[in-house]
Amino acid sequence: MKNKLPPFIEIYRALIATPSISATEEALDQSNADLITLLADWFKDLGFNVEVQPVPGTRNKFNMLASYGQGAGGLLLAGHTDTVPFDDGRWTRDPFTLTEHDGKLYGLGTADMKGFFAFILDALRDVDVTKLKKPLYILATADEETSMAGARYFAETTALRPDCAIIGEPTSLQPVRAHKGHISNAIRIQGQSGHSSDPARGVNAIELMHDAIGHILQLRDNLKERYHYEAFTVPYPTLNLGHIHGGDASNRICACCELHMDIRPQPGMTLNELNGLLNDALAPVSERWPGRLTVDELHPPIPGYECPPNHQLVEVVEKLLGAKTEVVNYCTEAPFIQTLCPTLVLGPGSINQAHQPDEYLETRFIKPTRELIIQVIHHFCWH
């Protein structure tokens, strides 16, 4: 029953008080089970059917799907339950205690993005779900901040095909219809160690990496010349060399060298296409030095994403907000949800607050976010 729900601010407070950090380091990584239980209980109180889905390959992480109504189509509202780790020395407030000051709600996950679920629950107080003509789905995912395992697994296993979806990431209520992807690789070269007094007796991995980097930089230039998407502020795929390490002493021939790099592909470029371009670029080195160069993923790749600009979802949201859709450079779960249905990224709070000490959401977003959620439910589930 709706009267069982706590007030909006208490829902928000409970979400922030329930830690659900995602991290690649096992010591920092936390299960989101308690947060999923909170959400599941609240949606059950509203009469929703709730399914909790364990996510394989994670450390006790779960997705939750709350649904009301049956039949084809409908609306999916989605978000992730996890947060990034926090630097205790840089926060001036308790990250797990919601505090309000000067028109801002402070706490880890206030903007990115536990707060979105508080907005959904509060908006549903004013929606008579018994009158829905199409189903309404609420998806809460795991591990967006690391592997995006929750969204990947849900998209791979669900039979749902809603009419459209909105992911409530912090966009300052500016609708986003496209973003670049992210591929991060480790280039590793295995040389042969030896004393520096006789270089011919070894294979210097740093020298081989120098050769490889030349080919990678040529790929970077080719990407800039061949691919264009003018809506982006950086209108081509970027390639960055971010980290390199090799050798251990000035008088030893370097046996190992490792380079970390990333590519941010634009929408429409497939992951297979990018892997092929990288392998082709490195082929001269691999052919000259067989078995010494390997390419490994640092994390599962994220493709670029785009919602068709002429889709009904774009038209409806632009009309409701009086704002045109945008494209952004950061990544979300949208590429995976987009495999199910046309998807927009749209939510309260600023992306500039994401992953920052003293993260906050401005209270000016409360009323318009609540109204927007009610409006999109009415449009896509009542008509």
UniProtKB/Swiss-Prot annotation:
The pathway it acts in is:
Amino-acid biosynthesis; L-arginine biosynthesis; L-ornithine from N(2)-acetyl-L-ornithine (linear): step 1/1
Subunit structure of this chain's protein = Homodimer.
Q: What class of enzyme is it?
A: hydrolase
Q: Which residues bind Zn(2+) 1?
A: 80, 112, 169
Question: What CDD domains does its record include?
Answer: M20_ArgE (cd03894)
Active-site residues, as the UniProt record annotates them: 82, 144
Where does this protein hold Zn(2+) 2? 112, 145, 355
Classification via Gene3D superfamilies = 3.30.70.360, Zn peptidases
Q: What does this protein do?
A: Catalyzes the hydrolysis of the amide bond of N(2)-acetylated L-amino acids. Cleaves the acetyl group from N-acetyl-L-ornithine to form L-ornithine, an intermediate in L-arginine biosynthesis pathway, and a branchpoint in the synthesis of polyamines.
What's this protein's family per the entry?
A: Belongs to the peptidase M20A family. ArgE subfamily.
Task: Quote the catalytic activity from the record.
Answer: N(2)-acetyl-L-ornithine + H2O = L-ornithine + acetate
PANTHER family (alphabetical): ACETYLORNITHINE DEACETYLASE
The protein depicted here goes by the name Acetylornithine deacetylase
- Which GO biological-process labels does this protein carry? L-arginine biosynthetic process
Q: Where in the cell is it found?
A: Cytoplasm
Q: Where is the signal peptide?
A: none
Quote the EC number: 3.5.1.16
Q: Which GO terms describe its molecular function?
A: acetylornithine deacetylase activity; zinc ion binding
What is the originating organism of this protein? Shigella flexneri serotype 5b (strain 8401)
